């Protein structure tokens, strides 16, 4: 039996899905990740347990299903719905925005980049630009370039945009498996307090950040271990008394739109496995302890006595995990040479220094770069698109492909493509790329 024929062991019948997980042990080579170690070691003695077959209720049948409500997923759902497709959005937490909101990674990077005339210009438009403008109008955004936003205001704005677009929102639910028919994805199993259910869809968009769906569908990918951190916010930073005897400068992060509140980033430990739940749990506790101890030390410093820990992020700062092996792998050379693509779905910028041809080029000099639609398409699975930090690119681009702006751009591109595919009754890989670009322009995206 081929991997794809087994993936979920499903039979669609009536109003329920028969699920037979645990029918056999999958070989490592069948996952397309033969060079990878298992995420977790099995129980001592290699013990396993069989999950009984059961009937799974179908919650909904829809045009487009987006899994993951971070910047990419939110933009994808809005774009899909605005394109006329009935759209469901499933998010495991109680908010949209992912690391932008729940992760307290508050800067919208990178809204600007250098064009061919060596001028700095705005590159984030469309749905991402609309989000930014709404936050500015609320007084909840500071800085014109790479604005820093208030997370609660951003949650509100994203909720409103989802509601206005007519997206069907499902919080507190987690995708647990995919429903496959030969090489086509037909839906997703979700877990929640309501139990296991299925949502069937004509097109599914993987915006999980970790590529959970394309992994479950059997696509090939790379795994990149990277630094994982935890952001926190400090309050009363406007009460710091620099005139106190013994005052010394302390690292208290950067300002936010709320007076007296700063956000403080943490790079964290290098080479961390974001796919290992035990590792994530250990990091969560360790980082929270370190942040608490750090703030107590700050409060002992003359002049900082009134500073307090406002909150730690509800999400760990996972920067990278799975990277899709898709139809086209975006390269460093592409992004540094203004390469144009016939199937461009958006443009992003850079926020960090890049070593290129033996020279360190600062972000302030780095060019804007196009993102091709092919980089969002898996090689084998039909009716599946990928957006966010796990689309197809070279590892050297990790600092630019994982930022909020890029996630918004890839999300809108995938959502518009999904809506167009449903409208035309085609698989996403078969849609007319010119029509996709026209649709994106109608939605306000800038394609260069």
Describe these PLM feature segments.
Residues 1-5, 27-31:
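N-terminal secretory signal peptides
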Residues 5-25:
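N-terminal export signals
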Residues 46-61:
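A short, basic/flexible loop-to-alpha-helix module at the beginning of a structural domain
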Residues 55, 127, 155, 172, ...:
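Flavin (FAD/FMN)-binding glycine-rich loop and adjacent Rossmann-like elements that form
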Residues 59-70:
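Beta1/beta-strand and adjacent pyrophosphate-binding region of the FAD-binding site
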Residues 73:
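N-terminal Rossmann-fold NAD(P) dinucleotide-binding loop
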Residues 79, 85-86, 91-177, 232:
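Conserved N-terminal/central alpha/beta ligand/cofactor-binding core
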Residues 179-197:
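Conserved beta-strand-loop-beta-strand element in the redox core of flavoprotein oxidoreductases
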């Amino acid at each position: 039996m081929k991997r794809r024929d087994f993936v979920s062991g499903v039979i669609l019948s009536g109003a329920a899905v028969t699920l037979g997980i645990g029918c056999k042990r999958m070989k490592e080579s069948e996952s397309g990740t033969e060079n990878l170690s298992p995420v977790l070691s099995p129980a001592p003695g290699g013990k396993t347990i069989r999950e009984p077959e059961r009937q799974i209720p179908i919650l909904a049948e829809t045009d487009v299903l987006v899994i993951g409500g971070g910047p990419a997923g939110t933009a994808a759902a809005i774009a899909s719905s605005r394109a006329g497709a009935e759209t469901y959005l499933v998010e495991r937490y109680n908010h949209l925005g992912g690391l932008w909101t729940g992760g307290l990674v508050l800067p919208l990077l990178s809204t600007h980049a250098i064009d061919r005339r060596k001028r700095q210009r705005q590159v984030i438009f469309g749905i991402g630009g609309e989000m930014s403008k709404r936050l500015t109008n609320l007084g909840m955004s500071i800085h014109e370039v790479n604005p820093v936003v208030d997370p609660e205001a951003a949650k509100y704005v994203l909720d409103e945009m989802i509601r206005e677009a007519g997206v069907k929102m499902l919080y507190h639910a987690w995708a647990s498996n995919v429903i496959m028919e030969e090489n086509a994805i037909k839906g997703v199993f979700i877990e929640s307090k309501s139990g296991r259910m299925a949502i069937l869809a004509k097109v599914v968009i993987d915006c999980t950040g970790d590529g959970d769906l394309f992994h479950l569908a059997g696509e090939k990918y790379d795994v990149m271990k990277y630094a994982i951190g935890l952001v926190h916010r400090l309050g009363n930073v406007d009460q710091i008394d620099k005139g106190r005897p013994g005052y010394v400068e302390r690292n208290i992060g950067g300002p936010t739109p709320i007076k007296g509140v700063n956000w403080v980033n943490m790079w964290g430990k290098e080479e961390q496995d974001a796919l290992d739940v035990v590792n994530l749990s250990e990091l969560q506790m360790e980082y929270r302890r370190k942040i608490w101890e750090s703030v107590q030390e700050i409060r002992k410093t003359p002049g900082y006595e009134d500073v307090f820990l406002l909150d730690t992020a509800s999400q760990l700062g996972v920067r990278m995990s799975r990277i899709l092996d898709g139809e086209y792998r975006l390269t460093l050379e592409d992004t540094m040479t203004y390469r144009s693509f016939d199937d461009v779905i958006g443009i992003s910028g850079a926020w960090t220094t890049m070593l290129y041809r033996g020279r360190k080029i600062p972000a302030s000099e780095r060019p804007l770069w196009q993102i091709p639609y092919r980089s969002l398409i898996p090689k084998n699975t039909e009716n599946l698109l990928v957006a966010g930090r796990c689309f197809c690119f070279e590892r050297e681009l990790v600092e630019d492909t994982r930022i909020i702006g890029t996630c918004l751009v890839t999300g809108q591109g995938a959502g518009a493509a999904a809506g167009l595919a449903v409208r035309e009754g085609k698989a996403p890989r078969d849609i007319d790329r010119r029509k996709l670009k026209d649709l994106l322009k109608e939605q306000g995206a800038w394609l260069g």
